[in-house]
Amino acid sequence: IELEGLLEILGYQSTGGCYRHDSRQVIFVGDFIDRGPHQRRVVELVRSMTESGAARAIMGNHEYNVIAYYTPRTNGGYLRERSAKNTGQHQAFLDEYARDAHDWAEAIDWFKTLPLWLDLEGIRIIHACWEKTSVDQILEFQNGSNLLGDELLHASGDPTTWQYKAVDTILKGKEIRLPNDGHF
């Protein structure tokens, strides 16, 4: 897969099914799924690297979206609507795990363990937009944690909440309406 080739170009070597480097650690910034072929292999590779300490990873909007797609609302339905558009976005991921519900559930559970951001010495890593207000609100709500958590997940599934806005901003970025219905 392309990711393995990129890791090799960067000097990582595969040992025991996990890519490692002698002097550095890769940081993955999410969107392991819903982009291109071999999504299951990408998830397995990133997971093995993070669990062995050879890498760090954060959640992207694609991981969040698939978590919400499979998380039931307390009042029925799912946190992410099961529309044709949303199903289509996840179809390749669904297809790759179609015969193995256990591995699929394990992948979703692993996505839930990914931090929303990393605030490391001298560098901050976030999928889309480091907005201090959103980060601070989440930290306060989560008692200092940068993990999604069930309460934040459910609250962020409601577009009328500040949690929705905060999670949407850090995972997708700010959206600004352009004049004259412009786009880029």
Q: Which residues are covered by each model-predicted region?
A:
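Active-site neighborhood of divalent metal-dependent phosphoester bond hydrolases
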Residues: 36-43, 48-178
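Short, intrinsically disordered, charge-balanced linker/junction segments flanking boundaries
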Residues: 1, 178-184
